[in-house]
């Protein structure tokens, strides 16, 4: 028996497909999302419809973004949901959520996007960074992720899980763990534990920065050298005198600073950029 086959579809490794089938877990996720009939919901990676079906039954319309051509075609011909579904066959990493918000006239309706999904673990972090760019048009997000990633999203200072992903996620959103999910809830079963997280974009950013590039840059540089003191890790960006003037302990390490501290550092860099920095540099590294 092919353990990677579920409901007639073979999971594709390149898409990071693991299909959710545990009824109690599905019910728990749908309850957490709490979809209402007139809301505009968007599912990323609907797969074989484990969440699509129970959510679709509760709403008037559901938009799904699916990269797998075969799965997208199945959803277009879904036996009882096809009239409710708008299937967008594309890579969510390339999708413009602002355009969807505008096209659907959600501002006039006083609504924002509600986004959810069982995200492929191999792209979950860059996909969330992509979604953070659209925080102004998103009401909330509910995602199934690798448990380790959820711990990092929800972490606080002075912990091993605290890192660049924590800072960037909590800069844009209030982050809350929802439930933990064992590998047995999926087919094929992943080799890691999973968890569901809720992210609610802040209505007003609590620690706004002048240029997001610098927040990204200072976090990347600090956490990529997290065993070093900040005096050494950030030596190409700040002099010891600058750090001290900004209220930073020279002997502190990356995990010791709060988001407000990183925002303060980023705003100083926006006003005092180092001469040799390339602002087009792409910072996608994990900390």
Swiss-Prot record:
S-adenosyl-L-methionine binds at residues 18, 20, 45, 66, 91, 118. GO terms for molecular function: 16S rRNA (adenine(1518)-N(6)/adenine(1519)-N(6))-dimethyltransferase activity; RNA binding. It catalyses: adenosine(1518)/adenosine(1519) in 16S rRNA + 4 S-adenosyl-L-methionine = N(6)-dimethyladenosine(1518)/N(6)-dimethyladenosine(1519) in 16S rRNA + 4 S-adenosyl-L-homocysteine + 4 H(+). SMART domains: rADc (SM00650). Keywords: Cytoplasm, Methyltransferase, RNA-binding, rRNA processing, S-adenosyl-L-methionine, Transferase. Its EC number is 2.1.1.182. Pfam families: RrnaAD. One of its GO terms (cellular component) is cytosol. Its main location: cytoplasm. It is found in: Cytoplasm. It comes from the Bacteria. Specifically dimethylates two adjacent adenosines (A1518 and A1519) in the loop of a conserved hairpin near the 3'-end of 16S rRNA in the 30S particle. May play a critical role in biogenesis of 30S subunits. Belongs to the class I-like SAM-binding methyltransferase superfamily. rRNA adenine N(6)-methyltransferase family. RsmA subfamily. PANTHER family: DIMETHYLADENOSINE TRANSFERASE, DIMETHYLADENOSINE TRANSFERASE-RELATED. This is Ribosomal RNA small subunit methyltransferase A.
């Amino acid at each position: 028996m092919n353990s990677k086959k579920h409901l007639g579809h073979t999971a594709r490794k390149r898409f990071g497909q693991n299909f959710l089938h545990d009824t109690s877990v599905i019910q728990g996720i749908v309850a957490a999302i709490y979809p209402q009939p007139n809301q505009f919901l968007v599912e990323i990676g609907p797969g074989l419809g484990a969440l699509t079906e129970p959510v679709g039954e509760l709403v008037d319309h559901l938009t799904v973004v699916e990269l797998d051509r075969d799965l997208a075609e199945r959803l277009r011909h879904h036996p009882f949901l096809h009239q409710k579904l708008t299937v967008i066959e594309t890579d969510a990493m390339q999708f413009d959520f602002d355009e969807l918000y505008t096209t659907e006239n959600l501002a006039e309706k006083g609504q924002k996007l509600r986004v959810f999904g069982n995200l492929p673990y191999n792209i979950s972090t860059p996909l969330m960074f992509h979604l953070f760019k659209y925080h102004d048009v998103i009401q909330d997000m509910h995602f199934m992720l690798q448990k380790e990633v959820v711990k990092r999203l929800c972490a606080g200072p002075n912990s091993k899980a605290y890192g660049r992903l924590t800072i960037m996620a909590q800069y844009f959103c209030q982050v809350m763990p929802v439930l933990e999910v064992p590998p047995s809830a999926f087919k094929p079963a992943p080799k890691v534990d999973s968890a569901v997280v809720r992210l609610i974009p802040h209505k007003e950013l609590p620690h706004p920065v002048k240029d997001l590039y610098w927040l990204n840059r200072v976090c990347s540089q600090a956490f990529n050298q997290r065993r070093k003191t900040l005096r050494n890790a950030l030596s190409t960006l700040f002099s010891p005198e600058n750090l001290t003037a900004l209220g930073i302990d020279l002997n502190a390490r990356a995990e010791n600073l709060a988001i407000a501290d990183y925002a303060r550092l980023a705003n100083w860099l926006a006003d005092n950029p180092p001469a040799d920095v390339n602002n087009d540099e792409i910072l996608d590294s994990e900390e």
